[in-house]
Swiss-Prot record:
Belongs to the orthopoxvirus OPG130 family. One of its GO terms (cellular component) is membrane. The gene is OPG130. It comes from Vaccinia virus (strain Copenhagen). Pfam families: Orthopox_A5L. This is 39kDa core protein OPG130.
Length: 281
């Protein structure tokens, strides 16, 4: 009986295809849930696409209805500048001690200037001399230059180092009336030159030697190396380092030789002990 039931059940399962309506209706709950989610996502995507198309259409309609905006033209305001008026220079009394410069050589422009003054005097009642600004005498310029040079010398602060001096500007007036000022260049003292040479030793260490050379001749020298050139100094240091390295190599070689000699001596003693034990047996 059980065999008949199993046979009928197997026959029913084999005769029902998977593509039938009965099988398609019985779906897995997870599959139904996934299909519902997929349908919801597709509907949501289509909704947002429709909203985007409508918004783009509204923007195009609004852009077409608007008129182009004309850019604003910049406005330029021109403010007239007042013409500067020449103020006459004050007349300074000439100094009796200052040398009188040579007068300038007049060219053909003097006749043109005199004609211009005559023409101005004919048009106005004022004399031609009143139309010219007051000029500063050349002796007053010499006084200003002398006072400037004197102030430069008196206001120069004393230097803390005797070997360093501050530059002083000196102004002079040439024969043609031009004023030239000169400032001497002062070279600052150079810092001392320090050279360091390091040499590795066979044992793994490093030996360094430092030498200092002061190029300033006015500085107080506390070492005899100041009078030696830098090239000679470096060659001397290198020679000393080579000699020191050779001595170190000899010392290390002697230590190695002593260690080897001790090892051989111990081996010989052990051989003698073994031979003595064999002799006793």
């Amino acid at each position: 009986m059980d065999f008949f039931n199993k046979f009928s059940q197997g026959l029913a399962e084999s005769s029902t295809p998977k593509s039938s309506i009965y099988y398609s209706e019985e779906k897995d709950p997870d599959t139904k849930k996934d299909e519902a989610i997929e349908i919801g996502l597709k509907s949501q995507e289509s909704y947002y696409q429709r909203q985007l198309r409508e918004q783009l259409a509204r923007d195009n309609m609004m852009a077409a209805s608007r008129q182009p905006i004309q850019p604003l033209q910049p406005t330029i305001h021109i403010t007239p500048q007042p013409v500067p008026t020449a103020t006459p220079a004050p007349i300074l009394l000439p100094s009796s001690t200052a040398p009188t410069p040579k007068p300038r050589q007049q060219t053909n422009t003097s006749s043109d200037m005199s004609n211009l003054f005559d023409w101005l005097s004919e048009d106005t009642d004022a004399p031609a001399s009143s139309l010219l600004p007051a000029l500063t005498p050349s002796n007053a310029v010499q006084d200003i230059i002398s006072k400037f040079n004197k102030d430069q010398k008196t206001t120069t602060p004393p230097s803390t180092q005797p070997s360093q001096t501050l530059p002083t500007t000196t102004c002079t007036q040439q024969s043609d009336g031009n004023i030239s000022c000169t400032t001497p260049t002062v070279t600052p003292p150079q810092p001392p030159i320090v050279a360091t040479v390091c040499t590795p030793t066979p044992t793994g260490g490093t030996v360094c030697t430092t030498a200092q050379q002061n190029p300033n001749p006015g500085a107080a020298s506390q070492q005899n190396l100041d009078d030696m050139a830098l090239k000679d100094l470096m060659s001397s240091v290198e020679k000393d380092m080579h000699q020191l390295q050779a001595e170190t190599n000899d010392l290390v070689t002697n230590v190695y030789d002593a260690r080897e000699y001790t090892r051989r001596a111990i081996d010989q003693i052990l051989q003698l002990v073994k031979g003595f034990e064999r002799f006793q047996k």
